[in-house]
Amino acid sequence: MAKIPDKIRTWQMTQPWGKDPQTGKIIEGKLEKKEISVPPLQPGEALVKVAGCGVCHTDLGYFYDGVSTVTKPPLTLGHEISGTVVAGDSRFIGKDVVVPAVMPCNKCPICEAGRNNRCLSQKMPGNSLGIYGGFSDYIPVPAEDLCIVK
């Protein structure tokens, strides 16, 4: 079993590209290599050691095109994630998984009606899952919707 790290190595978007509203001058975007603390896992969460993460047009939109993110920078982009669960929910430890790009709350009336794709409280790594995204070596995520790769 993999050793649980104290820190997550990550590439964080600290400044998206933009334009100064007063001068019109272009503001260059910044990605910075950082180390952030591994948070204490809550019940029902898993820590995934990232094997790979795709670069999606959504990530490019956040960085280059001014598309707003729910969590304001600094944050780690990346939501097309695969990896191995190393801690947390015992059903998944040691399993290779795909982390869904969007995770519903599974508790609201919309989810309970089977329409979790329409959930108003959904979370997305690299946007609305706090500062955590797939462009890192580990990511804490809700375990409930992980997809085991066989």
Regions found by a protein language model. Name each.
Residues C105-K150:
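NAD(P)H dinucleotide-binding glycine-rich loop of Rossmann-like/cofactor-binding domains
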Residues W11, G61, V98, P140, ...:
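Residues in well-ordered beta-strands of folded domains
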